[in-house]
């Protein structure tokens, strides 16, 4: 699968916008992404290794909920990680 990073996440991946990861599930892909780009780990995952709710995941344009991270994914899937922005 290919992870596509944008916005403030780029600085944690040495400004690499796309990172290809070989993994059977999105959960495994996130773990391997954090191994490949260690500075992303504390940004994407909490102390228990769970995906932080401040971010949203989209696979091939469709939002994926946290409960779906263990579902099988294909090698050609494109995963976008978007940071939710709030303010006033």
For each predicted feature, which ranges?
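Ubiquitin-like/PB1-type beta-grasp interaction modules and other compact soluble beta-rich domains
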Residues: 1-87
């Amino acid at each position: 699968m290919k992870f596509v990073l944008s916005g403030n996440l780029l600085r944690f991946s040495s400004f690499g916008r796309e990172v290809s990861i070989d993994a059977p599930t999105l959960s495994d892909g996130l773990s391997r992404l954090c191994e490949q780009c260690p500075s992303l780990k504390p940004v994407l995952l909490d102390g228990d290794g769970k995906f932080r709710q401040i971010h949203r995941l989209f696979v091939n344009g469709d939002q994926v909920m946290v409960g779906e991270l263990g579902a099988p994914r294909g090698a050609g899937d494109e995963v976008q990680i978007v940071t939710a922005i709030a303010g006033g």
